[in-house]
């Protein structure tokens, strides 16, 4: 199975590493516009294979989309990263042009590929390629909720003093600091609601810390995070190529689900060989419904800035 990763920056390189280390793809093509950059990253990773023993072949190329031909999955990470004080929405003007050009080239050589969108604002970028290229909704997956959910589960586990593996939780709605919706009502520790362990004030703090997770890292690092995002992408690719049918929150095109139409936003999805195989409609309480629809409205407003 062949995977292409567009953009050899921190997120692109880290997800390539995770994919290779797990040996579920036979080949990963890492593409970048900077001369020699992807080739260097690929060489470094392939030299690591002598230590780690993985068999995945990694090929680096400079803007040569012909080398990506017949990819099963294409990951798009290219675009301007967030800078300190910059919102994801402010990225839209620059990144919409980048994503459109990349997608056109990708589809020329891999017309049946499943596309995982990582470029921010991810809900809007996912919607853009849905509308511009008219692909089946199952083939465009926005990677936002997987990352937000990882941050939510980490914060819960930290507060509970338990392993992250003991904690289940989910974040839906938009992949934005203000619009994401961590679902406290459905978060559990070994099947028991976290509200049995933590008071309301602590839970509210966890929600706010989750929402600010990306911005906090941008402030500390001077750029966007890459380890957790790369791992989130790799988990999606793994679920597709191995047909795992995992339920992972992703930005998906809604056509009536949750009472919404014509919008890409974070919802729990079953991810398998065909991409998004099913959108799971959760039972939300009234407060969660109100916040979810408000998040949808905010994304629609950002989408209004797109030029097709």
Where in the sequence are the language-model features?
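C-terminal substrate-binding/catalytic lobe of Rossmann-fold NAD(P)-dependent dehydrogenases
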Residues: 132-139, 148-308
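Extreme N-terminal starter segment of soluble prokaryotic enzymes
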Residues: 1-3
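N-terminal Rossmann-fold NAD(P) dinucleotide-binding loop
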Residues: 12-13
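Rossmann-like NAD(P)(H) cofactor-binding subdomain of soluble oxidoreductases
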Residues: 87-153
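Conserved N-terminal Rossmann-fold NAD(P) cofactor-binding segment
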Residues: 33-71, 300-308
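Rossmann-like NAD(P)-binding element
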Residues: 51-113
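Glycine-rich Rossmann-fold phosphate-binding loop(s) that bind the pyrophosphate
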Residues: 8-9
């Amino acid at each position: 199975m062949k995977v292409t990763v567009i953009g050899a920056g921190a997120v692109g390189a880290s997800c390539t590493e995770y994919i290779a280390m797990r040996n579920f793809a036979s080949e990963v093509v890492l593409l970048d516009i900077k001369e020699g950059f992807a080739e260097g990253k690929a060489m470094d990773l392939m030299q690591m294979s002598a230590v780690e023993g993985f068999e995945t072949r990694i090929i680096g190329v400079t803007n040569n989309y012909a080398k990506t031909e017949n990819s099963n999955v294409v990951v798009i990470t290219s675009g301007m990263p967030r800078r300190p004080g910059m919102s994801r929405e402010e990225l839209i003007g620059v990144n919409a042009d980048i994503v459109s050009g990349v997608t056109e080239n990708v589809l020329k050589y891999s017309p049946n590929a499943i596309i995982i969108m990582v470029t921010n604002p991810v809900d809007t970028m996912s919607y853009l390629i849905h509308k511009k290229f008219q692909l089946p909704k199952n083939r465009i997956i926005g990677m936002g909720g997987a990352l937000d959910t990882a941050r939510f589960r980490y914060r819960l586990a930290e507060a509970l003093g338990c392993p992250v593996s003991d904690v289940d939780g989910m974040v839906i709605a938009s992949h934005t600091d203000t619009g994401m919706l961590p679902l406290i009502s459905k978060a559990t520790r070994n099947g028991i609601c976290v509200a049995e362990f933590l008071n309301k004030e602590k839970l509210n703090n966890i929600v706010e810390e989750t929402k600010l997770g990306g911005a906090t890292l941008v402030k500390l690092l001077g750029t966007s995070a890459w380890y957790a995002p790369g791992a989130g992408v790799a988990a999606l690719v793994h679920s597709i190529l191995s047909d795992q049918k995992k339920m992972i929150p992703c930005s998906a095109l809604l056509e009536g689900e949750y009472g919404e139409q014509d919008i890409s936003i974070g919802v729990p999805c079953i991810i398998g060989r065909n991409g998004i195989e099913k959108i799971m409609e959760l039972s939300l309480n009234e407060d969660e419904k109100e916040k979810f629809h408000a998040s949808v409205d905010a994304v629609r407003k950002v989408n209004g800035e797109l030029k097709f």
